[in-house]
């Protein structure tokens, strides 16, 4: 995992997280 300095969530990161969850879920 990459070390995160800032806890700021970008829309792209959220989209990637959701996409991964959906793919795993399938």
Swiss-Prot record:
Stated name of the protein: Neprilysin
Molecular functions per Gene Ontology: metalloendopeptidase activity
GO cellular component: plasma membrane
Main location: membrane
Annotated function: Thermolysin-like specificity, but is almost confined on acting on polypeptides of up to 30 amino acids. Biologically important in the destruction of opioid peptides such as Met- and Leu-enkephalins by cleavage of a Gly-Phe bond. Catalyzes cleavage of bradykinin, substance P and neurotensin peptides. Able to cleave angiotensin-1, angiotensin-2 and angiotensin 1-9. Involved in the degradation of atrial natriuretic factor (ANF) and brain natriuretic factor (BNP(1-32)). Displays UV-inducible elastase activity toward skin preelastic and elastic fibers.
Record field: catalytic activity: Preferential cleavage of polypeptides between hydrophobic residues, particularly with Phe or Tyr at P1'; substance P + H2O = substance P(1-9) + L-Leu-L-Met-NH2; substance P + H2O = substance P(1-7) + L-Phe-Gly-L-Leu-L-Met-NH2; neurotensin + H2O = neurotensin(1-11) + L-isoleucyl-L-leucine
Membrane topology classification: Single-pass type II membrane protein
Subcellular location(s) per record: Cell membrane
Lineage: Eukaryota, Metazoa, Chordata, Craniata, Vertebrata
Keywords, alphabetical: Cell membrane, Hydrolase, Membrane, Metalloprotease, Protease, Transmembrane, Zinc
């Amino acid at each position: 995992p990459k070390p995160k300095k800032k806890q700021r969530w970008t829309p792209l990161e959220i989209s990637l997280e959701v996409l991964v969850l959906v793919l795993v879920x399938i």
